[in-house]
From Swiss-Prot:
One Gene Ontology biological process: bacterial-type flagellum-dependent cell motility
Gene3D superfamilies, A to Z: 6.10.250.2080, secretion proteins EscU
Organism of provenance: Escherichia coli (strain K12)
Compositionally biased region (Basic and acidic residues): 8-25
This protein's name: Flagellar biosynthetic protein FlhB
The protein's role, per its UniProt record: Required for formation of the rod structure in the basal body of the flagellar apparatus. Together with FliI and FliH, may constitute the export apparatus of flagellin.
Compartments it resides in: Cell inner membrane
Keywords on record: Bacterial flagellum biogenesis, Bacterial flagellum protein export, Cell inner membrane, Cell membrane, Membrane, Protein transport, Transmembrane, Transmembrane helix, Transport
Membrane-topology descriptor: Multi-pass membrane protein
Chief place where the protein resides: membrane
Family according to the record: Belongs to the type III secretion exporter family.
Length: 382
């Protein structure tokens, strides 16, 4: 039993995932962020490399141009430096903006947007060096190390192959004008970066899968955890059973309180009792105010006798009413004729009690459709 509760072999429930999300525990892939940043850099160089090269060449020329008129004036020197910095910022603004935007958006692509203050709260347990030492030799750390080694080998191989293949072209840059050389250099850098991106895409895909798998594995639950969560979110089954029992008892008390209002109680002496009420000025059809089987039926009869409610033994009708009529609801239309005969007998019985004479004969052979009777079914004793 203890082994079952200790082994976290079950997938996390939606509630567990949502709770972890609220605590800031979501899958993250640094490799995905790096890839997107690299893509932004490649795009800027590929589509705006010539413009960037020209602006950087202009800055380089301006920085290497010495004007004797400003050498002895510190204010002019400072102004020149500020101008160069501004030109550099404007030249690199597309690249910087793209990198910042990707750095903000890329984490949302995998784990979604989460604002959690719990991850910012200080945890003094992190000051304990033992967990840190354990993490250094964990499988997660080993996987990260292996991934870093493979990434270094892959990027180094792609870059080395590119430099070897384009070495003559790179050497010719020294013979070109600065602006032309800068533009061609940007093209080479963009092509090299594009090859690196294509090379690391499979690794990034594997890393995304690995991070999601590791996240779900870390949130795995034992069967006992799932049972405890069910008790907390849905309620303890024993408590829920007790609540349902109390609700049934309260409903039964309300039902018994309505028995004295009934006009007649129809009985199957062996099992069932159904109390009916009809007010021709307020109701379009008779309704059931109480019904029960077994001990409940016996209690309905006792309350009816204490309040002088007429009773009629009509087993088929009692069974049909018990099965097909609900408490507080009107009786089914198929039973109108049978109940009408019963109510007519009740009206005659009231007149007899007031005026005397010959006692009315109880109706027999009431017209109850066979489809509504269930004579062979055993009742549930409530």
């Amino acid at each position: 039993m203890s082994d079952e509760s200790d082994d976290k072999t079950e997938a996390p429930t939606p509630h567990r995932l949502e709770k972890a999300r609220e605590e800031g525990q979501i899958p993250r892939s640094r490799e995905l962020t790096s890839l997107l940043i690299l893509l932004v850099g490649v795009s800027v160089i590929w589509f705006g490399g010539v413009s960037l090269a020209r602006r950087l060449s202009g800055m380089l020329s301006a920085g290497l141009h010495f004007d004797h008129s400003i050498i002895n004036d510190p204010n002019l020197i400072l102004g020149q430096i500020i101008l160069l910095i501004r030109e550099a910022m404007l030249a690199l603004l597309p690249l910087i903006s793209g990198v910042v935007l990707v750095a903000l958006i890329s984490p949302v692509m995998l784990g979604g947007l989460v604002f959690s203050g719990k991850s910012l709260q200080p945890k003094f347990s992190k000051l304990n060096p033992l967990p840190g030492i354990k993490r250094m030799f964990s499988a997660q750390t080993g996987a990260e190390l292996l991934k870093a080694i493979l990434k270094t080998i892959l990027v180094g191989s792609v870059t080395g192959f590119f430099l070897w293949h384009h070495w003559p072209q790179m050497m010719r840059l020294m013979a070109e004008s600065p602006i032309t050389a800068m533009g061609n250099a940007m093209d080479l850098v963009g092509l090299c970066a594009l090859l690196v991106v294509l090379g690391v895409i499979p690794m990034v895909g594997f890393d995304v899968f690995f991070q999601i798998f590791s996240h779900l594995k870390k949130l795995r639950m034992s069967r006992q955890d799932i049972r405890d969560e069910f008790k907390q979110s849905e309620g303890d089954p024993h408590v829920k059973g007790r609540i349902r029992q109390m609700q049934r008892a309260a409903a039964r008390r309300r039902m018994m309180a309505d028995v004295p209002k009934a006009d007649v109680i129809v009985n199957n002496p062996t099992h069932y009792s159904v109390a009916l009420q009809y007010d021709e000025n307020k109701m379009s059809a008779p309704k059931v105010v109480a019904k029960g089987a077994g001990l409940v039926a016996l209690r309905i009869r006792e309350i009816g006798a204490e309040n002088n409610v007429p009773t009629l033994e009509a087993p088929p009708l009692a069974r049909a009413l018990y099965r097909h009529a609900e408490i507080g609801q009107q009786i089914p239309g198929q039973l109108y004729a049978a109940v009408a005969e019963v109510l007519a007998w009740v009206w005659q019985l009231k007149r007899w009690r007031l005026a005397g004479g010959q006692r009315p004969v109880q109706p027999t052979h009431l017209p109850v459709p066979e489809a509504l009777d269930f004579i062979n079914e055993k009742p549930t004793h409530e």
